[in-house]
Amino acid sequence: MKIPGARRIAICAILCLLMNVTCLIIPAKAEGGFIRTSGTRFTLDGKPFYVVGANNHYLTFGSAREVTRVLDDAVAMHANVIRTFIQPVIGSLDGTTVPTIWDWKSKADASDLGVNGAYMLYWDTARNRMGINDGPDGLQRLDFLVAEARKRGLRLIVAFLDFWAYTGGAQQMRAWYGSRDENTFFFTDPRAKRDYLLWVREVLTRTNSIDGIRYKDDPTIFAWELMNEPNIRPEPLYRSWIEEMAGYIKSIDPNHLVGSGHANVSNKLSDLSIPILDFGTWHGYPLYYKLTPARFDRLITEFCEIGRRHQKPVLLEEFGFARSNRDQVAVYRMWLKTLHDNPDCAGWLIWRLVSLQDSGRFPKDSHDQFDIRNDEGEVWAVVKDAAKSGALRRYQND
């Protein structure tokens, strides 16, 4: 019987005490190597790795129980990758010197952005600069997520920030300096760029407080993303910022893949031509782009073909179709089959997997109605079956 790493360490520690000897306990390493690319495929240890999984937005601020429920449901779904972004970001801790531009004090469930006092970055009034919270309500939340994902054999795609202000993100960071410019200030102001670089370095070089593994050395991380949906304008600024920041990440961490995290629908994956990016990302919501399900299905094929032309993997890393649509089950079945059958499609991550909250209820999902739940319903069955077959997918020429 194979004993899990954490339990193995505990057993070793007990044995050392019983035998009255000093033991050197070496932290366990994640199983398997780092994810690589080969043409339009992701690979693991030289073999194709087809991405199947989901997004979850509260994994870095939900309670320990809420986080482990999501990860357990991901395992039940047969997922191999979960995507999230590091958040929240707030103003000054006194709440007044530099205001927080979103409702940090909300008492809502985690899924509805009740963060219960968690924050990663803040404005340090004493030092008049960005502060980083590495405590139990800060980066130790990320430590817990990574360690728990490893226990379950899950890989994580992690975006360093969110562009949007829902839990602060880049918008809170530009507000530290009094700016209201959402699309350019953060990406051009020397102070904001310095903050981002310091944050990236802090994360990459951090040693996990639970298992002792540095993030940049941890294969549990599937890939880093510069930001969730960096809506940078104009296009030349976007490309120059991506090139600069991706280069900085790789100068510190050559082990992991780097993606932009961009939605990339309107520009049709234009950033795939940036050499330093390892793979392409796109976020597909027919509702927001006024597309029929059939037109979106054709778009899947079109975007995977773009990947083939550039010889890079293309990942549909967000997509959703509201449960209020009577044909939701059939539409998901169609899209997932199209992705599965195309050898140039690298995989998919549905938006979004949610689990029981500490309130004992599932989130209300009254806004976009994209939530996926382990409720044994028809949608869950379709997604679960697609993930199971996708995780076992083999290419004809392998």
What are these regions (language model features)?
Residues C16, A28-A30:
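Cleavable N-terminal signal peptides
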Residues A6-R7, M19, M227-N228, V383, ...:
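Residue-level micro-sites within transmembrane alpha helices that shape
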Residues C12-C23:
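Bacterial N-terminal signal peptides
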Residues K2-I14:
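Bacterial N-terminal signal peptides that target proteins for export
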